[in-house]
């Protein structure tokens, strides 16, 4: 039996109710060199053969004999062997909720002052509201007291269930108090505002807040830290003929959320916050827990817009989503933390698997600002996914683009593919449906203009980092991806700039149908067992600028028609470092190379390599402090020089 190292005692809050959660921690269980992430941990128990982890209202069972260690930060020795030290800290990030720290990040979306902007009307201050005190509804257990501007509304009350009809413009409501069996339902022909001020409301049989009007619903959260609001729905809804009831907070029209308070939503049926138009978060702290299978914490049919505030979602139902839109999704500011803990499920009607995803859009997604942190721990789980596939008898169409324009993105997945082993045809080709974990996925083209993107996928086989079914175009920004399967995978890549590090522990670093590179830094690392640092499938590979370092057991070489020279070298010995040097021994580029590579293959391409000049390849047995051994002396005569062979 392997020894289990328990490095800390765990007594952490259970994230199961729509209450203000205390800081929670993830643990990292190392099993056979792979790391499984278990989040929202409450406690851990042991028997001689089994370890039980209690978390978020359920349990995870792990085999003791197969566990190497448990840590509060990931146990990982591979990166220190294969990456230069400057990259190590790029993967030391975690995704967890922390009330104290998250509250400090609440910053409102800057006001839009241009009346022609599509989001101008989403700001409450840009509208005229009825004078006076508004309509105050105070819930008190089994009843509700309604005061204020009653001339503008018609009220029906059944216990603590309040229904309001109004045709007036600019009506505003203030909801407070508590009830374990209450709700607020609004029929309005005009826009309306609902302020939540210390409201604690549960509706066992339907939505807690339900707006059946097509106009905007302004949802303002006040009260700060001490007077937060919490809403909970039940696992079953009473049907209402001709009406949608998609979630704990539901509106037929747009939902615009603002205010300086905190809102906690506990959803059990479908969605936490849902709009048949779009949801726009401008300010406040919004925390949504969703327990439903295939449920969505925040859902916008046409769009989800996050411009400010703090948005946190936790989905533990199978195939659950954090933020999900049937069309567009846009982030321009704020802090998003999205965690999914459910597994993939097979959907008979679609003849395919549906898996969890922290942020999902069916069409285009634009990440133009803010900070986004995603963690998906279940089988087939994904961090960010844009677009969808349309399959016809003759062709598959990829719809929906993903664009990065300045956002800081941190993604982690800890799940494996489901089923673990795919079916194969008589030729050994994988067939049949499966759910594979992905860090970031785009159906159509992915464009990276700026920002910082960090992806870590450590669960196991098929855990890919960044994938596009079409091309990935990189103009700038910083990209770091470290995964079990392909670190980056695309139909092709046009790289004009940026700083990109890609690393795989069991497959190719960068698997792309073509690569056309004119600028930036591309450092890509593949597994030591027959895998490639850079695999272009033998297709177009042209280099006219920038720098490439590719480390693997094999690599593809640029076409000789490239205007920038490259050197591809093989080495059949175990060394800890390799360097490209000029003819006098001055090192131009040095990289770490673990002993496990045999053969070792490295591709260098940069502006220092000139046709007609002479160079050396130097090796270092133990460290860069050793006296180097000259492996190759050579002169570059063509755009691509190959030294040695497989």
Task: Locate predicted features.
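Cleaved targeting-peptide boundary
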Residues: 18-25
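Extracellular interaction modules
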Residues: 37, 59-68, 537-543
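Structured surface patches comprising rigid loops and adjacent beta-strands/short helices at the edges
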Residues: 38-46, 63-75
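N-terminal targeting signals for Sec/Tat export/insertion, comprising classic cleavable signal peptides
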Residues: 28-52
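Charged, amphipathic alpha-helical segments
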Residues: 36-42, 68, 559-568
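A composition-driven surface/loop motif
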Residues: 77-646
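Hydrophobic h-region of N-terminal signal peptides that target proteins for export
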Residues: 9-17
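Positively charged n-region of N-terminal signal peptides that target proteins for export
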Residues: 1-4
């Amino acid at each position: 039996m392997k020894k289990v190292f328990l490095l800390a005692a765990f007594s952490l809050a259970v994230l199961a109710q729509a209450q203000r959660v205390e800081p929670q921690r993830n643990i990292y269980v190392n099993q056979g060199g792979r790391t499984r992430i278990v989040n929202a941990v409450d406690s851990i128990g042991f028997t001689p053969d089994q370890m039980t982890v209690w978390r978020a209202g359920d349990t995870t069972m792990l085999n003791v004999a197969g566990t190497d260690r448990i840590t509060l930060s990931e146990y990982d020795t591979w990166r220190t062997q294969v990456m230069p030290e400057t990259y190590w800290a790029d993967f030391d990030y975690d995704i967890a909720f922390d009330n104290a720290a998250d509250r400090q990040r609440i910053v409102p979306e800057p006001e839009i002052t241009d009346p022609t902007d599509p989001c101008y009307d989403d700001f409450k201050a840009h509208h005229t509201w009825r004078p006076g005190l508004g309509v105050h509804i105070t819930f008190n257990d089994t009843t509700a007291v309604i005061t204020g501007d009653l001339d503008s509304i018609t009220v029906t009350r059944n216990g603590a269930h309040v229904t309001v009809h109004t045709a007036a413009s600019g009506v505003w409501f203030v909801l407070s108090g508590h009830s374990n069996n209450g709700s607020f339902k609004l029929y309005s022909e005009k826009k309306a505002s609902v302020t939540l001020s210390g409201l604690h409301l549960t509706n066992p049989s339907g939505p807690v807040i339900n707006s059946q009007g097509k106009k905007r619903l302004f949802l303002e959260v006040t009260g700060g830290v001490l007077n937060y609001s919490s809403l909970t729905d039940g696992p079953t809804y009473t049907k209402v003929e001709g009406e949608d009831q998609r979630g704990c907070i539901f509106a037929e029209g747009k939902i615009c959320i603002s205010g300086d308070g905190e809102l906690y939503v506990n959803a059990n049926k479908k969605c936490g916050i849902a709009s048949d138009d779009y949801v726009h978060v401008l300010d406040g702290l919004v925390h949504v827990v969703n327990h439903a299978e295939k449920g969505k914490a925040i859902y916008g049919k046409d769009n989800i817009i996050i411009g400010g505030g703090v948005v946190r979602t936790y989905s533990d139902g199978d195939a659950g989503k954090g933020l999900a839109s049937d069309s567009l999704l846009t982030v321009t500011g704020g802090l998003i933390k999205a965690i999914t803990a459910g597994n993939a499920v097979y959907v008979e009607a679609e003849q395919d698997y549906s898996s969890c995803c922290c942020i999902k859009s069916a069409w285009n997604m634009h990440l133009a600002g803010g900070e986004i942190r995603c963690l998906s721990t279940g089988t087939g789980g994904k961090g960010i996914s844009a677009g969808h596939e349309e399959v016809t008898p003759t062709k598959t169409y990829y719809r929906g683009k993903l664009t990065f324009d300045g956002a800081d993105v941190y993604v982690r997945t800890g799940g494996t593919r489901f089923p673990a082993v795919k079916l194969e045809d008589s030729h050994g080709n994988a067939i049949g449906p499966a759910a594979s974990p992905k860090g970031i996925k785009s159906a159509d083209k992915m464009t990276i203009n700026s920002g910082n993107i960090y992806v870590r996928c450590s669960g196991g086989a098929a855990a890919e980092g960044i994938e596009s079914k079409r091309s990935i175009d990189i103009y700038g920004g910083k990209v770091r991806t470290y995964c079990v399967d392909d670190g980056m995978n695309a139909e092709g890549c046009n790289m004009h700039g940026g700083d990109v590090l890609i690393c795989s522990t069991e497959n190719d670093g960068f698997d792309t149908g073509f690569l056309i590179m004119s600028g930036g830094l591309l450092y890509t690392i593949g597994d030591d067992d027959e895998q490639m640092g850079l695999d272009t499938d033998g297709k177009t590979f042209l280099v006219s600028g920038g720098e490439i370092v590719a480390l693997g057991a094999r690599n593809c070489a640029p076409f000789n028609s490239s205007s920038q020279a490259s050197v591809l070298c093989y080495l059949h010995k175990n060394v800890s470092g390799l360097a490209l040097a000029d003819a006098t021994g001055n090192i131009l580029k040095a990289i770490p190379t673990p002993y496990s590579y045999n053969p070792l293959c490295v591709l260098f391409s940069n502006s220092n390599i000139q046709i007609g000049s002479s160079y050396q390849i130097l090796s270092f047995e133990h460290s860069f402090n050793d006296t180097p051994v000259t492996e190759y002396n050579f002169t570059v005569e063509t755009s691509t020089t190959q030294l040695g062979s497989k």
